[in-house]
Design a protein with these regions (language model features):
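Active-site loop/oxyanion-hole signature of alpha/beta-hydrolase fold enzymes
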Residues: 96-135
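Catalytic active-site module of serine/aspartate enzymes centered on a nucleophile-bearing elbow/loop
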Residues: 280-343
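Conserved alpha/beta-hydrolase catalytic His-Asp/Glu region
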Residues: 173, 192-247
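Gly/Ala-rich beta-loop-alpha elbow adjacent to hydrolase catalytic centers
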Residues: 139-143, 147
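Conserved loop-alpha-helix segment in the C-terminal half of the alpha/beta-hydrolase fold
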Residues: 256-289
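Conserved HGGG/HGGXW glycine-rich cap/lid loop of the alpha/beta-hydrolase fold
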Residues: 55-103
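Flexible "cap/lid" loop of the alpha/beta hydrolase fold
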Residues: 152, 161-189
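Short beta-strand/loop motif that positions the catalytic acidic residue
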Residues: 248-249, 255-257
Length: 343
């Protein structure tokens, strides 16, 4: 009886995942055209499809590629995308493995989702869609780490690298706590043969399940997202974008820092900026009154700033620092004040 119940528990989530994704999988047969809007799956290989939402650019206008934060899907970008599309900017959103509609298609996620695989999927997606490079990337948090990894692997394909509160290295508090637990476990159970990686992932799993639902309630929107989020963290936790900065192209990096970020401190992002070669620095903006997920907290302001980058505003390619005030609709640098999109 016990084994029967266990088999049911294993079978149920797999069945639910299949039913969640069945409607979307039909969209994969639709042909993608860079001149037309598109919502659906794009086939990268017989075993791999990614969900895409695409709005084509107006004539002679650029396209921007948005890369999801850790708990994001294409949906969370809506308020940020609207102002860009209204100005004629083309926008490509997609759900990588472990996120959004792509997660539902392949759920449950039972193995680490390696950041290197996500980078290659993005490269293959851009090839498949035949969107011409070099590309404009906007990556939030986890997506910032992915974008930085893409710039390291394919620097010649990057035009603008806009990193919003990006993952630059493991979070020090979490990392130190887990390492302390590993040390304590070694003292209490000296004969146990678990590797450091196995113990690290064990305690990381506990942190994700115990704290993420309270911090990010959206993580409970479907039965698979919490475990998938752990698998995403598991796959990026050893990455150190702060060590990859030498590959960033000239005047490509635009760093966006939320002053009230609850996850990544300003000091950590300043440390990242300091590691970037001066020739690669384009702009750094500190956004006052914004929390970590700035495209939801201040979507009009962030969209305006990204629009100015995409349109090549020369002031934003001099490596200068800016202070942004979304609710005043202003950006300041020294004695200069620039009027921008107001919240």
């Amino acid at each position: 009886m016990r084994s029967f119940l266990l088999s049911c528990l294993i079978f149920i989530p797999i069945t639910i995942g299949a039913s969640f994704s069945s409607a979307q999988s039909q969209a994969s047969t639709k042909d993608f055209d860079v001149l037309r809007a598109y919502n659906g799956f794009v086939t990268l290989s017989p075993q791999r499809e990614l969900y895409v939402k695409y709005s084509p650019p107006a004539p002679s206008m650029p396209t921007v590629i948005l890369i999801n934060g850790l708990t994001y899907s294409t949906r969370q970008w809506e308020n940020f995308v609207g102002p860009l599309v209204a100005k004629g900017i083309g926008v490509l959103r997609f759900d990588p493995i472990g996120q959004g509609e792509t997660l539902l298609k392949y759920a449950p996620a039972l193995l680490p989702i390696q950041i290197e695989d996500q980078i290659e999927d993005l490269y293959n997606l851009l090839l498949k869609l035949n969107i011409k490079g070099p590309y404009n990337f906007v990556g939030l948090s986890y997506g910032g780490g992915l974008a930085a990894g893409f710039a390291t692997a394919y620097p010649k394909l990057v035009k603008n690298l806009v990193l919003m509160a990006p993952f630059t290295r493991p979070l020090e508090g979490t990392d130190n706590w887990i390492k302390a637990q590993i040390w304590a476990t070694r003292q209490i159970f000296p004969n146990k043969k678990f590797s450091d990686d196995e113990l690290y992932d064990h305690f990381l799993h506990q942190i994700v399940y115990a704290t993420y639902p309270q911090a990010e309630p959206v993580i409970l929107e479907n039965p698979f997202k919490l475990e998938a989020t752990f698998r995403l963290v598991q796959g990026i936790r050893k990455a150190r974008p702060i060590d990859w900065t030498h590959k960033i192209p000239k005047k490509a990096l635009h760093l966006m820092v939320a002053r009230q970020d609850q996850y990544i401190s300003v000091d950590v992002l300043d440390e990242y900026w300091d590691a970037v070669p001066e020739k690669a620095r384009a702009s750094r903006i500190y956004i006052n009154g914004s929390e970590h997920k700035m495209v939801e907290a201040v979507p009009n302001f962030t969209a305006y700033w990204v629009h100015q980058i995409l349109m090549g505003n020369a002031k934003l390619f001099k490596g200068l620092d800016y202070e942004g005030y979304p609710f005043l609709g202003e950006v300041r640098s020294g004695s200069e004040t620039i009027k921008v999109g107001k919240e």
